[in-house]
Amino acid sequence: MGKGFYISKPVGIVSIILCAGALATIIALSVVYSEEKAKNNNQVSPTDGGTTSKPPVTTLAPSNEPWDKYRLPKNLVPDHYNLTLWPRLTPDLTTGLYIFTGKSTVEFETTEETDLILIHSSKLNYTILENGHLARLTSVNSGVRVPLIKVSWLQSVTQYLVLQLDGKLMTGHRYHLYTKFTGELADDLGGFYRSEYMEDGVKKVVATTQMQPTDARKAFPCFDEPAMKAIFYITLIHDRGTVALSNGEEKGYPVTIDNQHVQKTVFEPTEKMSTYLLAFIVSDFDFINNTIDGVWIRIFARKPAIAAGQGEYALNKTGPILKFFEKYYNSSYPLPKSDQIALPDFNAGAMENWGLITYRETALLYDKEFSSNSNKQRIATIIAHELAHMWFGNLVTLRWWNDLWLNEGFASYVEYLGAHEAEPDWNVKDLIVLGDVHRVFAVDALASSHPLSSKEEDIQKPAQISELFDAISYSKGASVLRMLSDFLTEEVFTMGLRTYLSEFAFGNAVYTDLWKHLQMCLCTRISRTLRPTVNIIFPQMGFPVVTIDTKTGVVSQKHFLLDPDSEVTAPSPFNYEWIVPIKWMKTGAVQSPYWLRGKSATNDAMKALGTEWVLANLNVVGYYRVNYDEENWGRLLNGLSTNHQLIPVINRAQLVDDAFNLARAKIISTVLALNTTKYLDKEREYMPWESALNNLDFFYLMFDRSEVYGPMQDYLRKQVTPLFNYYKTLTENWSKVPDGHMDQYNQVNAISLACRTGLEELKPSALSVVMLSFFRIHPNLRSTVYCNAIAASGANEWEFAWSQFKNATIATEADKLRSALACTKQPWLLNRYLEYTLDPKMIRKQDATSTIVYIANNVIGQSLAWDFVRARWSYIFTQYGGGSFSFSNLINGVTKRFSTEFELQQLKQFKEDNAEVGFGSGTLAVDQSIERTTANIKWIAENKQNVLNWFRDETKPVF
């Protein structure tokens, strides 16, 4: 958001007052939002005139047949596909379903003789061809006998089209496999699917795709593994007046097919690429464009969004970010165009399809009057994340999904670098500590965590692949790569990336290939080996806590576990020890780096005398937590109290986060952790405050139903008051927002916590006379104001907010309202809202699970949401996609407040009751929730009274 956007002084005051209860603030927001799409409940399989298929054959018992294995054999290698698809954007007259038809010819080479063809296929109906089978096989090589197809069938469990031949395919020969098929253009957000929206009272339909990780097979038969790269010749048939897009540049012309006047769009052949990076879209969207150094950049979205200028920010930032990565990789962008499109329905945040990146609307579209500072940062970082993939992931691709972290961890690291290039005044690179390092510590500290890199044979099924799209792959990957870049130096790190990309361009690699290149570049600088360090980091889960005893200089490490009583069953070849790079300072002076290479060692330089203090892991570049002897903790706390700016701002955030988590792990006392917050009345920086609030959220979750809640509120209200007054002065009594990016974030923290704790100035009685004023609320403050307003209101106000949500035309505004609707204190409204989540007419499928989590975040809604998920799990899982990445977030979200034996038993029963249904990508989250709940029960039993006493002592009146 630009710093020139202000609100008037009296309006600013009212906007703060209303966080205590005036829903009238929402009245000013009268905008038109697209109606929710109607769900087609007809479950009939899609058909097309004249097409039939043999019934699927499913093997009921385990077998060793190739078609019962989830991995393709290596004897067939695709070269290219000729694919024509025709999505129908109106329902089929016979079935009432939206369908697509297609035909495909794939050319492949035989690398080993075989009489069996396996090609992935899911939820497709095939036309029986003239040979009586589901496919036709011909030879590319002249004079070569082509075996006949003896039998063809669909193996639904492992998702294959199987062709048994009457003879062998010859090694070194090439063949064509032709199929004709029909699929449903469903609203399931996977494969080739349907998105809907309303425009000027008319329902519009978009045909779009999401292939990653294993849904290209839902769009056409293909060798659907990342190492099976090929060239794709794509043709789309579509209604005239609509626009067709795919990975390559397009050329369209009108044709007539079966007396239908349609458009035929032919795309330039792709580069050699993986199936999961394919995309094809048909819509009547509009676009804006620019050309930078010969690369055509286009931003597509709904016509009203483009007309309103919502694509301008993305267009303006894409070019600089793209140029940054060209320089960073020392490699030109390999395609002639870069299309980015905002979709009304999209399950992930964005997808890096090569040349056609797809986004949720909230991840690409920015409106200066409705989008907040955090919305803008999200757009910049997600664009950078996806553009980073154009080289790291697309040009060079993982060989198999067990190395997913190499794709996603790398993009999650350099997204901060790319966003910094786009917005250098933000200091966004520092935020990786809060957004990724601290985030993943919470997961990786569980005994049920998993290593960055799994064994290939352990990741076979689509659900197992989906499980890997988690905080470990994204955030731990980013954190560890940042650490490597730091101790190797950015120069060596980027040099290794460049040689790696050069060697494996248009091919596939494993993570050890990258280490080889980093090692080669390291050896050009110093004769030090990288292998021991990375070998220890990547095959074992978790991370260490490093303890420094400043009395003796002894530095030691152990595996950090949030619950020290939990049992680690996964063996480690390194016994959960790490080689730890330690950057540190003594009393404000930076010291020489130190490497801990064993369980413990002595470093005399780390002894502290008198008032000296030691602080390790400067700027949190290392992937570990730090503990100290009690005396050094005391000196650090004294330093925070007397001259906190002597400690780097990132490390002030680190001290708070480390202390609270060390206390949860019983390594230090909870009282010591709470003492790290006492200096906050002097703190004005965002990162320490955000770190404190993130950790105090755990206290809210554990104690907002107990007698601890009142004294805790009193203490936090006391601590936030100076920050609140600071921003009140800085913004001239709330007449504007601060200039700085971090200051804007911290202003929101100050207001949110002041509202949450009932600061007197924000109570309705203070300025009730102006509470009915009509005005606009700054986008940064809307989430806070809306939530507090709805929490203090009743059913009529909730209904009004619901109507504003349904009519919102700005995706970020709709998201704020959708979240705020979960803040009501009326149980019946929350129960009804839960029912809405499973009705796509009310809540889009992409938003269903996050809405349930919003409701669970409400102390009143938590038990309602949990009961709802338990009762509806089978329906949620089957109707909302067993491979959806969002199930882990759902399970973690509805169970994070669990802290009683009763809730633990319910959770275990939930796991047992739904074992047959399954949990898909949430499988690991169930075990993590059980482990987390067990730890919470113990922690409350051991700490509740001490915490209560501490808050009471800190809020006693001073006479």
What feature does the model see in each segment?
Residues 109-125, 233-239, 564-581:
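Surface-exposed beta-strand/loop patches in extracellular or lumenal glycoproteins
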Residues 143-170, 210, 214-217, 361-382:
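Aromatic/His-enriched, Gly/Pro-containing loop or helix-boundary segments
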Residues 206, 267, 298-568, 572, ...:
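Hydrophobic alpha-helical and helix-loop surface patches within well-folded domains
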Residues 437-438, 442, 477, 549, ...:
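Long, ordered, helix-rich scaffold segments
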Residues 2-102, 200-206, 226:
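N-terminal, polar/Ser/Thr-rich
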Residues 87-91, 106-112, 123, 183-185, ...:
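Beta-strand elements of well-folded, non-transmembrane domains
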Residues 69-76, 80, 100, 107, ...:
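Extended, low-hydrophobicity, Ser/Thr/Pro/Gly-biased non-transmembrane segments
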Residues 124-199, 603-607:
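A surface-exposed beta-strand-loop module
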